[in-house]
Amino acid sequence: MGQPGNGSAFLLAPNGSHAPDHDVTQERDEVWVVGMGIVMSLIVLAIVFGNVLVITAIAKFERLQTVTNYFITSLACADLVMGLAVVPFGAAHILMKMWTFGNFWCEFWTSIDVLCVTASIETLCVIAVDRYFAITSPFKYQSLLTKNKARVIILMVWIVSGLTSFLPIQMHWYRATHQEAINCYANETCCDFFTNQAYAIASSIVSFYVPLVIMVFVYSRVFQEAKRQLQKIDKSEGRFHVQNLSQVEQDGRTGHGLRRSSKFCLKEHKALKTLGIIMGTFTLCWLPFFIVNIVHVIQDNLIRKEVYILLNWIGYVNSGFNPLIYCRSPDFRIAFQELLCLRRSSLKAYGNGYSSNGNTGEQSGYHVEQEKENKLLCEDLPGTEDFVGHQGTVPSDNIDSQGRNCSTNDSLL
């Protein structure tokens, strides 16, 4: 987001030096510009490369094309726009110590900045709600949230984010009335984001705090339910093991089925942890900035401009973290390796459902259709335990020893 202040002091700039030798001061300034330029360029490259990789992987590999990963694609798009249209201009603003792109682009750039942050937090909020319904109502989930509905939700998220970001800024509802702000608005080389108190508080609440509270509340409920289900699984599997030990010893396939079905449930809980890490990282990166954003308009001189800019850039860096977090998922790791040509042949990945849309055929269609469905966790199915007891085998890979549905979306493990 735009920086507050008068535009004369920038993050980590050596302007405070009063060295007697002008040449030494100028040399230090050049070293600082080069060093910060390299660091900021690496940040931009990491954001763009990582999120292009995520978007391409989900678009190319059918196994990754789940409802949840549609939302992940939306999140990656927000991060990609941040890396292409926001961070580079923010870096230029800092390195050049002035704004050289004109007043129109200043407001447009600020609007895109707010848009990306708002779209990201709202998408994370939607993902939390998605996981809540998936874990609490796995049988109703697929009819409740189809891929077409997911596309509509994503479109609505971006429309709402666009309205809350572009409308107030382009209509100048954000503008402060004190003289320093008025001078900046009239100056083509000034792009400090002076805002009135009402806008700063309202935009922070609508764009960040409300979605954050919803996300934290819903995801805490998801983890409570996941913990309850894990405890239930542990207890029921213990009873089943004691009651059917001799039978399992007689039929090795049963033991294999039990182990495999248990892995489905554990994988889904690992997926929840990964999503929790994504949400937690986003919160840790952006919460300090939004706290300072409100404090700054209430007490102007309390927060140094350098601190404000530093916290803003910590938020920017978050856009490069998510692709690294996705590497926790074996599915994403395999997809990334395929895209980066780090695997010998995609044919070896058919067993994991990894065939690109262009190469998908009869060989892998059945497995892909089975695996890409987005049922979650475990729900009791009456009568299946009796079936297992009489037949000696688990009726399906997606049904565990106690008859619980353990289909999993393991693309985010």
Curated annotation (Swiss-Prot):
Keyword Transmembrane helix assigned: yes
Transmembrane segments: 35-58, 72-95, 107-129, 151-174, 197-220, 275-298, 306-329
Topology, Extracellular side: 1-34, 96-106, 175-196, 299-305
Impact when changing Y354A: Does not affect insulin-induced tyrosine phosphorylation or insulin-induced receptor supersensitization
Cited InterPro entries: ADR_fam (IPR002233), ADRB2_rcpt (IPR000332), GPCR_Rhodpsn (IPR000276), GPCR_Rhodpsn_7TM (IPR017452)
Membrane topology: Multi-pass membrane protein
Compartments, as annotated in UniProt: Cell membrane; Early endosome; Golgi apparatus
Short name of one Pfam family: 7tm_1
Lipid positions (S-palmitoyl cysteine): C265, C341
Keyword list, A-Z: Cell membrane, Disulfide bond, Endosome, G-protein coupled receptor, Glycoprotein, Golgi apparatus, Hydroxylation, Lipoprotein, Membrane, Palmitate, Phosphoprotein, Receptor, Transducer, Transmembrane, Transmembrane helix, Ubl conjugation
Keyword ATP-binding tagged: no
GO BP annotations listed: adenylate cyclase-activating adrenergic receptor signaling pathway; adenylate cyclase-modulating G protein-coupled receptor signaling pathway; adrenergic receptor signaling pathway; AMPA selective glutamate receptor signaling pathway; bone resorption; brown fat cell differentiation; cell surface receptor signaling pathway; cellular response to amyloid-beta
Binding-site residues for (S)-timolol, renumbered to this chain: D113, T118, N293, N312, Y316
Organism domain of life: Eukaryota
Outcome of substituting Y350A: Does not affect insulin-induced tyrosine phosphorylation or insulin-induced receptor supersensitization
Binding-site residues, (S)-carazolol: D113, S203, N312
Compositionally biased spans, kind Polar residues: 393-413
Residue numbers bearing the Phosphoserine modification: S246, S261, S262, S345, S346, S355, S356
Region Disordered: start-end pairs: 392-413
Residues recorded with modification Phosphotyrosine: Y141
Modifications made to the protein after synthesis: Palmitoylated. Mainly palmitoylated at Cys-341. Palmitoylation may reduce accessibility of phosphorylation sites by anchoring the receptor to the plasma membrane. Agonist stimulation promotes depalmitoylation and further allows Ser-345 and Ser-346 phosphorylation. Also undergoes transient, ligand-induced palmitoylation at Cys-265 probably by ZDHHC9, ZDHHC14 and ZDHHC18 within the Golgi. Palmitoylation at Cys-265 requires phosphorylation by PKA and receptor internalization and stabilizes the receptor. Could be depalmitoylated by LYPLA1 at the plasma membrane.
UniProt-annotated glycosylation sites, renumbered to this chain: N6, N15
Main localization, broad class: membrane
Function: Beta-adrenergic receptors mediate the catecholamine-induced activation of adenylate cyclase through the action of G proteins. The beta-2-adrenergic receptor binds epinephrine with an approximately 30-fold greater affinity than it does norepinephrine.
Record text on subunit structure and interactions: Binds NHERF1 and GPRASP1. Interacts with ARRB1 and ARRB2. Interacts with SRC. Interacts with USP20 and USP33. Interacts with VHL; the interaction, which is increased on hydroxylation of ADRB2, ubiquitinates ADRB2 leading to its degradation. Interacts with EGLN3; the interaction hydroxylates ADRB2 facilitating VHL-E3 ligase-mediated ubiquitination. Interacts (via PDZ-binding motif) with SNX27 (via PDZ domain); the interaction is required when endocytosed to prevent degradation in lysosomes and promote recycling to the plasma membrane. Interacts with CNIH4. Interacts with ARRDC3.
Name this polypeptide is given: Beta-2 adrenergic receptor
Species this protein is from: Homo sapiens
Source taxonomy: Eukaryota, Metazoa, Chordata, Craniata, Vertebrata
Gene behind this protein: ADRB2
